[in-house]
């Protein structure tokens, strides 16, 4: 895969020890579970989990919703998963963010799967972009989506599961469209693409 810009801020990145194999076995791990782990292992676990799971390459999406009072809101997310084909369910994993405050009101969200040439869109909706023009939206089934995306998936929120410091928003798919093209990918804290 080819490498492009690395993100800063709160996005997954490479650790100083990236490239060296790192042990995934916690010191002093016993059948007693997490309580037996050392304080150091526990305090470094979030960073190391980001680094480890950052090696799981993903696509990049923009989640959108529309609120009567506030209009369209969008955010970049790669914590997106196909959960079930019948019934058709997907999930989006959200941390503390504005989207998570708006979704209980709208009860619906759209997933735009970004194409290789939409890195600037991903940066913008992650709050890290420098767009000079406001992004346009296209509407389908009453939900806004990003034009130029490879797929549009519209969902009604069917279930909500708090999970640690995130919440899993399970959506029942109401409509979907897709086209062929190269995807935008995210790997080890960087946007990239197919080789
Ligand atoms: C590759 C990647 C994957 C990520 N995956 C996840 C994930 O799975 N889960 C997670 O919780 N976080 C994820 N994030 C982080 C997340 O994108 C940011 O924390 C984001 O800022 C959260 O958005 P928000 O809802 O809090 O809204 P804001 O931070 O308020 O909005 C995000 C940005 O979108 C712009 N924006 C929103 N609506 C509009 C509009 N209608 N018109 C124009 N601009 C608009 C805002 O101006 C802002 O710049 C990811 C970030 C990256 C880079």
For the regions a language model picked out, list residue spans one by one.
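Basic, polyanion-binding surface patches
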Residues: 2-195
């Amino acid at each position: 895969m080819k490498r492009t810009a690395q993100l800063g801020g709160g996005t997954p990145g490479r650790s100083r020890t990236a490239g060296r194999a790192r042990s995934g076995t916690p010191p002093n791990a016993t059948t007693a579970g997490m309580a037996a782990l050392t304080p150091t292992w526990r305090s470094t676990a979030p960073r190391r989990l980001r680094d480890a799971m950052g090696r799981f390459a993903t696509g990049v999406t923009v989640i959108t919703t529309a609120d009567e009072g506030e209009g369209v809101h969008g955010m970049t997310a790669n914590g997106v998963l196909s959960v079930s084909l019948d019934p058709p369910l997907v999930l989006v994993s959200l941390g503390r963010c504005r989207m998570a405050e708006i979704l209980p009101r709208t009860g619906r969200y759209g997933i735009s799967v970004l194409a290789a040439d939409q890195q600037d869109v991903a940066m913008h909706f992650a709050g890290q972009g420098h767009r000079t023009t406001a992004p346009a939206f296209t509407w389908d089934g009453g939900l806004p989506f990003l034009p130029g995306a490879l797929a549009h998936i519209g969902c009604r929120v069917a279930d909500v599961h708090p999970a640690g410091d995130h919440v899993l928003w399970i959506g029942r798919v109401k409509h979907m469209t897709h086209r062929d093209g190269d995807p935008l990918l995210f790997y080890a804290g960087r946007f990239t693409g197919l080789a």
